[in-house]
């Protein structure tokens, strides 16, 4: 039973090189989705080991894509690059340095450059229809997605362009200000929901009108329109409703994007997801359940079945992290203090091993009297003096299928501009 460091020590697999992952890769081999988490958005070790896992799943188990907690339109340039598609940039570094929306460090870092260049090299050996993709799945950067829809239609279908432009003119008074739009809607009760939905339905229902577009380009067009549509709802609900409504709106968008990618890659496709533990660890086994919040981990288990999904968390006892002191503030390297007592991090730190992972099984799950522990959760905004508030009450072996632990972690290596 999952109860103490002494019991847990019998289950650990030390991280001593790529071969340490053998058991995990075999466990993940036949899953439809493998979700890889992180306890922060700015930790080197989380990115490094997610990279190692992703490479092996792709090279050895034929996984088809990686979907990350990032913007769809801007990160699609990286997808073009790793697939060597028309319009691709000259290097992953060049593309990632063009990212502009805060927090840029989440993807504009050396760790992602290394993964992207490996993907490019791996894909160069494959036919075009088997190349592995890299996609953003988040709901943000909607004005860029709106521009991409219009720019693509302008050169492919003048009638469609005119129709979509008329629909999107609903946003014209707000000129790129989504919060301004949401506040205006809250006051006037007039919104653009019908307009954005009309665009999605027009593109989805008229595939024959876009016959000159490849499946990849059509997917790009449709998915950008979905971003605009779901972002409209997300911002509107953020102002008008309680927090769980907008949170769940964003979650359903990300989950929907992952499902769309599974459909894009066809029967027997398999995907990898990179996102915060808050998104990939099953919300049913955290305090999120009490507020009605869901997440991707929960929805994928419900949709695909527990046996077809692997949820892998990442966490640490202490270390350094890249984060911002407030939303939009310049990033800085911060110190994460030692984990609080009654946390899984405090428990795992008692084990005399610098880094390791555990794979949970039915013997670890106590359905009658589950043990609730804190689980570190550092966001892009972080205040180390309030670190004790950054722990999510969690039933660990039920929230995750596996958990990686590091005694001390270091900050992401951000690209220099």
Q: Where are these predicted regions, by residue range?
A:
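Structured catalytic-domain cores with a bias toward divalent-metal coordination
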Residues: 2-417
């Amino acid at each position: 039973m999952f109860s103490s460091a002494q019991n847990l020590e019998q289950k650990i697999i030390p991280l001593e090189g790529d071969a340490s992952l053998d058991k995990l890769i075999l466990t993940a081999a036949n899953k439809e989705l493998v979700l890889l988490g992180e306890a922060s958005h700015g930790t080197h070790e989380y990115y490094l080991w997610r990279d190692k896992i992703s490479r092996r799943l792709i090279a050895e188990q034929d996984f088809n894509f990686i979907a990350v907690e990032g913007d769809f339109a801007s990160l699609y340039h990286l997808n073009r690059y790793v697939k060597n598609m028309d319009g691709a940039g000259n290097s992953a570094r060049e593309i990632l340095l063009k990212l502009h929306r805060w927090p840029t460090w989440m993807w504009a870092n050396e760790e992602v450059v290394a993964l992207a260049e490996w993907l490019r090299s791996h894909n160069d050996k494959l036919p075009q229809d088997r190349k592995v993709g890299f996609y953003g799945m988040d709901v943000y950067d909607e004005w860029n997605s709106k521009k991409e829809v219009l720019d693509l239609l302008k050169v492919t279908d003048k009638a469609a362009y005119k129709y979509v432009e008329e629909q999107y003119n609903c946003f014209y008074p707000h000129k790129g200000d989504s919060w301004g739009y949401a506040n205006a809607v809250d006051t006037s009760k007039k919104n653009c929901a019908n307009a954005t939905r009309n665009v999605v339905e027009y593109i989805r229902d008229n595939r024959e009108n876009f016959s000159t577009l490849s499946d990849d380009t059509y997917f790009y067009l449709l998915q950008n329109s979905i971003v605009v549509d779901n972002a409209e709802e997300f911002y509107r609900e953020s102002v008008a409703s309680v927090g769980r409504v907008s949170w769940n709106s964003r979650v359903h968008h990300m989950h929907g994007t992952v499902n769309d990618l599974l459909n894009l890659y066809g029967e027997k496709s398999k995907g990898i997801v990179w996102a915060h533990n808050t998104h990939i660890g099953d919300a049913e086994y955290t305090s999120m359940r009490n507020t009605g919040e869901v997440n991707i981990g929960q929805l994928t288990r419900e949709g695909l079945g527990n046996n077809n999904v692997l949820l892998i968390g990442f966490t640490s006892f202490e270390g350094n992290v890249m984060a911002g002191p407030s939303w939009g503030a310049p990033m800085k390297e911060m110190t994460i203090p030692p984990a609080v007592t009654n946390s899984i991090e405090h428990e795992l730190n008692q084990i005399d091993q610098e880094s390791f992972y555990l794979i949970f099984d039915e013997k670890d799950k106590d359905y009658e009297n589950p043990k609730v522990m804190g689980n570190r959760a550092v966001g892009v905004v972080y205040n180390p003096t309030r670190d004790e508030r950054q722990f999510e009450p969690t039933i660990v072996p039920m929230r995750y299928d596996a958990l990686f632990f590091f005694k001390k972690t270091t900050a992401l290596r951000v690209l220099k501009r």
